[in-house]
């Protein structure tokens, strides 16, 4: 199927309803033999490395728990360098750069604004001209999201939206894809200034859950912006949330505060806790 045909199909497909149904199915307990056979088939199809998983297949009673599985302790050591920025996830770099007057690159010839992404022009202003990167999490990847630097969680924004796929065809053809899909933004104050960790939903990514509060997306609730009155500390590498299936994370920093490593290029594979940049 070519990209144009795929996009036309996605245009008419009831993506939100499909994601709801898939999400419900992943949370349903089913007979263990059937469930374990399905998980094993999924792991084989997507080349999931269960040697890295905290537990074996038998430990996960639902697909949702399998998707959000933890890693074996110590498997992803976090670079403790004082000025080191670490990857918040396991994934592959889709784009990376420094925003040009608040504009970021989605794909060749397609840009979006930080204002659109965060849904709040005031919240977006501090990130104009700053470092940003987009990291894609495939179905085989570890689906939890962590802090790239230590600091405090200052608030979050839940922005309801659509459920377009975030595969290459959509990224190359859907204008402002990451700004129309549902997302959950976590705001941090770090040693490198303000940081936004944007978790973007997608088709069949039924929910995004925060680790620091009772926040779950795609539950029929309206959008919400919340600022914490007291500091909520988070260490570098501390868990911020999780996807029920893979999707995309976008990091935003203030200008002249973070410089990306030369190795952080488009299509580069990144691992949680590994260095991707430095504080300047």
Swiss-Prot record:
Cross-referenced InterPro entries: PS_Dcarbxylase, PSD-B, PSD_type1_pro
In-chain residues carrying the UniProt-annotated modification Pyruvic acid (Ser): 247
GO biological process, one term: phosphatidylethanolamine biosynthetic process
Necessary cofactors: pyruvate
Membrane-topology descriptor: Peripheral membrane protein
Gene Ontology CC annotations of this record: plasma membrane
Subcellular localization, as worded in the UniProt entry: Cell membrane
Co-factor binding comment: Binds 1 pyruvoyl group covalently per subunit.
Record site: Cleavage (non-hydrolytic): 246-247
Pathway assignment: Phospholipid metabolism; phosphatidylethanolamine biosynthesis; phosphatidylethanolamine from CDP-diacylglycerol: step 2/2
Record flagged with keyword Lyase: yes
Primary residence: membrane
Catalytic center residues: 90 (charge relay system), 146 (charge relay system), 247 (charge relay system), 247 (schiff-base intermediate with substrate)
Keyword RNA-binding carried by entry: no
EC number, UniProt record: 4.1.1.65
Pfam families reported in the protein's UniProt record: PS_Dcarbxylase
Function: Catalyzes the formation of phosphatidylethanolamine (PtdEtn) from phosphatidylserine (PtdSer).
Family of the protein in this entry: Belongs to the phosphatidylserine decarboxylase family. PSD-B subfamily. Prokaryotic type I sub-subfamily.
Name of the featured protein: Phosphatidylserine decarboxylase proenzyme
Species: Myxococcus xanthus (strain DK1622)
């Amino acid at each position: 199927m070519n990209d144009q045909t795929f996009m036309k199909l996605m245009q008419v497909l009831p993506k939100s309803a499909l994601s709801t149904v898939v999400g419900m199915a992943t949370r349903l307990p089913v007979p263990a033999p059937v469930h374990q056979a399905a998980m094993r088939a999924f792991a084989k199809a997507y080349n999931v490395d269960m040697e890295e998983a905290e537990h074996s297949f038998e430990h996960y009673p639902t697909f949702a728990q399998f998707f959000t599985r933890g890693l074996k302790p110590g498997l992803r050591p976090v670079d403790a360098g004082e000025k080191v920025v670490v990857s918040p996830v396991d994934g592959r770099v889709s784009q990376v750069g420094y925003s040009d007057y608040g504009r970021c690159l989605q794909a060749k010839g397609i840009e979006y604004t930080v204002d659109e992404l965060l849904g709040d022009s005031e919240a977006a202003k501090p990130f104009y001209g700053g470092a940003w990167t987009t990291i894609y999490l495939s179905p085989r990847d570890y689906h939890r999201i962590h802090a790239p630097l230590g600091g405090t969680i200052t608030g979050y924004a839940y922005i309801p939206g659509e459920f377009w796929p975030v595969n290459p065809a959509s990224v190359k053809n859907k204008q402002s894809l990451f700004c129309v899909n549902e997302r959950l933004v976590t705001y941090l104050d770090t040693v490198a200034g303000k940081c936004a960790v944007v978790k973007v939903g997608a088709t069949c990514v039924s929910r995004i859950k925060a680790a620091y509060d009772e926040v779950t997306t795609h539950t029929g609730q309206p959008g919400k912006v919340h600022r914490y009155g007291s500091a909520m500390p988070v260490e570098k590498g501390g868990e911020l949330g999780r996807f029920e299936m893979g999707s995309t994370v976008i990091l935003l920093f203030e200008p002249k505060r973070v410089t990306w490593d030369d190795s952080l290029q488009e299509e580069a594979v990144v691992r949680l806790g590994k260095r991707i940049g430095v504080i300047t």
